Amino acid sequence: GFEVILLSATVDPVAESIGECVGAKRVYSSELNFSSKNICDGTIGRDLLGNKKDTMYELSLVSNELVFVTDNKSDSSCIELCDEFIAVVPSGRKKNYEFWKDKGIRRIICL
């Protein structure tokens, strides 16, 4: 079996909702700041955009196998921590295909 873990730079309320939809057991995301009255102040406390490598490293210490799927080039820093890395290239982004190919990624999904 496997465990779905969502690691996304989107803000936590959105990530939690997506996590529920895909059956994620754990969700790691950027976090909004809230006041003591639980009102969002519009700022981000922790931003995962371009900063997922530390979380991936922690997951690699306790996981038998890590498969990473992304369409974000800044996630290339996580390649070395994964057993399998799958890049997704959105329609109209041919340069992204070359980017992933140059990084040695063999599994590239073009939409």
Predicted regions and their residues:
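C-terminal cap/substrate-recognition subdomain and adjoining C-terminal extension
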Residues: 2-111
